[in-house]
Amino acid sequence: MRRVTLFLNGSPKNGKVVAVYGTLSDLLSVASSKLGIKATSVYNGKGGLIDDIALIRDDDVLFVCEGEPFIDPQTDSKPPEGLLGFHTDWLTLNVGGRYFTTTRSTLVNKEPDSMLAHMFKDKGVWGNKQDHRGAFLIDRSPEYFEPILNYLRHGQLIVNDGINLLGVLEEARFFGIDSLIEHLEVAIKNSQPPEDHSPISRKEFVRFLLATPTKSELRCQGLNFSGADLSRLDLRYINFKMANLSRCNLAHANLCCANLERADLSGSVLDCANLQGVKMLCSNAEGASLKLCNFEDPSGLKANLEGANLKGVDMEGSQMTGINLRVATLKNAKLKNCNLRGATLAGTDLENCDLSGCDLQEANLRGSNVKGAIFEEMLTPLHMSQSVR
């Protein structure tokens, strides 16, 4: 069995010892696998082309090419090799016309699977062009490359002012610096204006109220007040349409003529609140407390809670003369001792609702569901014309 030492064309370093068998094509296949190239021809140390396997002797030194002419390793015009091995070799990169000097270990060790590591981990493997100073030419943006090189040096992402992080991210993706990509994506996300969905506090809202003239309508549509303490505030005529007021404390608040259409009031406390002329169409007040509230407007303006979800609400002792609760859901609600004179309860779900002690004079209960409802101690008897079924 014969064995030979294979080198890349023009390089006397990092050779591979292989066994010679079969044909010249077999040797080229082995050379391609060992050296990571597409070998097409083999030369001896004197530049002679080997075209027959029989010409190869034991312990020959051969140079493998990818089709380029033979380069004598002793007269190679490339900069001289370092004396301490390739992991400490200094090299210069010409990136977009700007020079960067670093070591192979910097480019290889931090991200061994990156493009830069594959380009420089073995000398001579990468056949890129070099300029007149021997610097490797890389056609990329130097201002975006500098943060990447510094990251490979010390592992910290440092980007100077005025440099777009998106540009650095694209360069990191190009060179395959995976760990840096994660850092950059986080940095870009943190640099964006925050999408603040946190609830508005009482202090912030009071500041809005003080800055708004009393005759101007404050627009709070769709805002998040979840859990806020808005008790005892003057909230007249404010547009809370589709706002999140869940678990809010609105006790003793003045919500006269406020628009709470489709608002979320679930779990909120509105005890003793002034709700004259309030608009609460299709609002969700499930589990809320509305004890001793006043819905009755002396001017005749009626509160509108049509289609509202009032499951399990506690409205005990509230004044609701003329209120519109058409097709609302009051299942398991507590309406003890409420004044519901002239109220519209047509199509309302009153299943298991406690209406004991209520005044339902002239109230419209046509088509309402009163299954399991409690009508004890009524102030006025229900008339057949009210059509309870």
UniProtKB/Swiss-Prot annotation:
PANTHER family: BTB_POZ DOMAIN-CONTAINING PROTEIN KCTD9. Keywords: Phosphoprotein, Repeat, Ubl conjugation pathway. Pathway: Protein modification; protein ubiquitination. CDD domains: BTB_POZ_KCTD9, KHA. GO terms for molecular function: cullin family protein binding; identical protein binding. It holds the Pfam family KHA. Forms pentamers. Component of a complex composed of 5 subunits of KCTD9 and 5 CUL3. It comes from Homo sapiens. SUPFAM superfamilies: Doublecortin (DC), Pentapeptide repeat-like, POZ domain. InterPro entries: 5peptide_repeat, BTB/POZ_dom, Doublecortin_dom_sf, KHA_dom, Pentapeptide-BTB/POZ_domain, SKP1/BTB/POZ_sf, T1-type_BTB. One of its GO terms (biological process) is protein ubiquitination. Residues 89-161 form the BTB domain. Residues 224-256, 258-297, 338-376 form the Pentapeptide repeat domain. Residues 3-82 form the KHA domain. The modification Phosphoserine is found at S11. This is BTB/POZ domain-containing protein KCTD9. The keyword Repeat applies. The keyword Iron-sulfur does not apply. Substrate-specific adapter of a BCR (BTB-CUL3-RBX1) E3 ubiquitin-protein ligase complex, which mediates the ubiquitination of target proteins, leading to their degradation by the proteasome.
